[in-house]
Amino acid sequence: MYHCDHGGLLHNPNGPAIIYPDGEQFWYINGKRHRENGPAAINSAGRQFWFINGYDITDQITEWAKYRDIDLDNLTEMDKMIISLEWGNYGK
């Protein structure tokens, strides 16, 4: 399943823009991989990759979360808010 905007760019502000039958999911905003409150890519094995504004920040956010004692696999609503505030403008 694919979600696109009127210009044909992958885009879904409410969930994954791509969902494959094998369980892979990809979040996009305006054609760029982007998700502020969770991983923007989850492969069929469950591995998670974090993207903000098209930039892969998986390594950076993993280190950042360890330093702040945030469990990226079990995010609370407060964790999601902190991530959005800290990382939402990355790459802009």
Regions found by a protein language model. Name each.
Residues 1-92:
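Glycine/tyrosine- and acidic-biased, solvent-exposed loop/turn segments at the edges of beta-strands
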